[in-house]
From Swiss-Prot:
Protein's name according to its UniProt entry: Disintegrin viridin
Subunit structure comment from the entry: Monomer (disintegrin).
Keywords in alphabetical order: Cell adhesion impairing toxin, Disulfide bond, Hemostasis impairing toxin, Platelet aggregation inhibiting toxin, Secreted, Toxin
SMART domains in the cross-refs: DISIN
Known function: Inhibits fibrinogen interaction with platelets. Acts by binding to alpha-IIb/beta-3 (ITGA2B/ITGB3) on the platelet surface and inhibits aggregation induced by ADP, thrombin, platelet-activating factor and collagen.
Amino acid sequence: AGEECDCGSPANPCCDAATCKLRPGAQCADGLCCDQCRFIKKGKICRRARGDNPDDRCTGQSADCPRNRFH
């Protein structure tokens, strides 16, 4: 418990593999809405929708790509 990121790889520049905590200044370590240890800005498409549904977009507050309510 208490892990902030996946400490499997010491090569991840966002995550301290020894402590499983984000490195100083990092907001995230991975995820569809994480780029270079930072949350991707709100509104960026993170998952293209199928059919007539709207695309899923980053919130700017999380590394996760939220599913829109039509999925």
